[in-house]
């Protein structure tokens, strides 16, 4: 099983819960085929964070490596939001771009 941490940087964008759900659905659709070929299944962990929490997540990523295979950071304050992140082996999917 592949575990993907999806961390949302919250901004002042409206209706963020709905946007978060929509983004996760896009990620599932975009990633599921590639992930299933390598790992068998995909489990997504969602979290919301501000800049300081995000910095902590990145700093502690190596210590928490066994907890997830990839980290995507999504900025909800951008009009054309994007999700970019490294997904470690054995997965072949290295970068995701998700647009509205």
Locations of the language-model features?
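Short S/T/G/P-rich N-terminal loop/turn motif that feeds into the first structured element of a domain
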Residues: 1-21
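Generic secondary-structure microfeatures
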Residues: 8-12, 27, 47-49
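Short amphipathic alpha-helical segments
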Residues: 14-34
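Residue-level signal for secondary-structure boundary sites
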Residues: 14-16, 53, 81-82
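Generic alpha-helical secondary structure signal
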Residues: 18-21, 52, 91
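Short, intrinsically disordered low-complexity segments
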Residues: 29-77
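Short, mixed-charge low-complexity intrinsically disordered segments
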Residues: 61-100
């Amino acid at each position: 099983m592949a575990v993907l941490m999806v961390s949302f940087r919250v901004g002042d964008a409206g209706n963020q819960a709905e946007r978060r759900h929509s983004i996760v659905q896009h990620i599932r659709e975009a990633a599921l085929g590639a992930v299933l070929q390598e790992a068998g299944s995909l489990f997504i962990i969602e979290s919301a964070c501000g800049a300081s929490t995000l910095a902590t997540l990145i700093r502690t990523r190596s210590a928490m490596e066994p907890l997830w295979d990839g980290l995507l950071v999504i900025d909800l304050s951008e009009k054309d939001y994007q999700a970019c992140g490294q997904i470690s082996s054995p997965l072949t999917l290295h970068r995701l771009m998700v647009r509205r």
